[in-house]
Design a protein with these regions (language model features):
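N-terminal cysteine/histidine-rich coordination modules
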Residues: 1-72
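Short amphipathic beta-strand and strand-loop transition segments with alternating hydrophobic
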Residues: 5, 147-154
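Domain-exit/linker segments immediately C-terminal to small folded modules
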Residues: 44-126
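Short Lys/Arg-enriched alpha/beta "domain-start" segment
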Residues: 126-127, 132
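Long, low-hydrophobicity ectodomains and other hydrophilic envelope-associated domains
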Residues: 135-143, 150
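Extended, well-ordered protein cores
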Residues: 162-165
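Conserved small/polar residues in nucleotide/adenosyl-binding loops
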Residues: 174-175
Length: 176
């Protein structure tokens, strides 16, 4: 845990914000939802009440799923996390995590997708292959349609599926 002194973007006054290098659902089950909603990363200025989302690198450990997700906020942390997750960092006891699912992600959308897949007990590798196949199929059916991203998401109605985005907006939706 680290305590940072930040300047509020609204009132320009200083306040303290606590970051956590790791979130372990085995130690605090409520943290799983706070990470998913973003609440774990919100700092609220005690002077004016302005709430701001702060991004920083952290490890997410879900013991019941044997899953480790490292969110890397910068390139240096990304490289370090890759070394840890692949057993190339001698300071980490590799035997303890060798049989765990280990992923390093570099943006919040990918993190949220991986967490959703954990919740649904789906293999993210299969989902990634399905996204490539969906994109390939789409290119054959609609060659002029350019897709920026394909995400596996849960809709407001609770259904899950693939959302294809074009210019930041959903252009196609395949649900289960």
């Amino acid at each position: 845990m680290a305590i940072l002194t930040l300047t509020c973007p609204a009132c320009q006054k200083l306040f303290s914000f606590t970051t956590h290098p790791a979130f372990d659902t085995g130690e605090d089950a409520s943290i799983a939802e706070k990470v998913r909603t973003g609440e774990a990363f919100v700092g609220t200025c005690p002077h004016c009440g302005h709430a701001e989302h702060y991004s920083y690198s952290f490890l997410y450990k879900e013991r019941e799923s044997h899953a480790l997700l490292y969110y890397a906020d910068n390139e240096e942390d990304f490289r370090k996390a890759c070394a840890i997750m692949t057993g190339r960092d001698p300071s980490v006891p590799w035997a303890g995590i060798a049989d765990w699912s280990r992923r390093v992600v570099a943006n919040r959308q990918v993190l949220l997708e991986k967490l959703l897949l954990l919740d649904l007990h789906l293999d993210d590798r299969v989902i990634e292959i399905m996204k490539v196949l969906a994109h390939s199929f789409l290119q054959k059916q609609k060659p002029g349609l350019l897709v920026d991203a394909i995400w596996f998401e849960r809709g407001a109605d609770g259904r899950t599926g693939y959302c294809l985005y074009q210019n930041g907006k959903i252009c196609l939706l395949y649900t289960s």
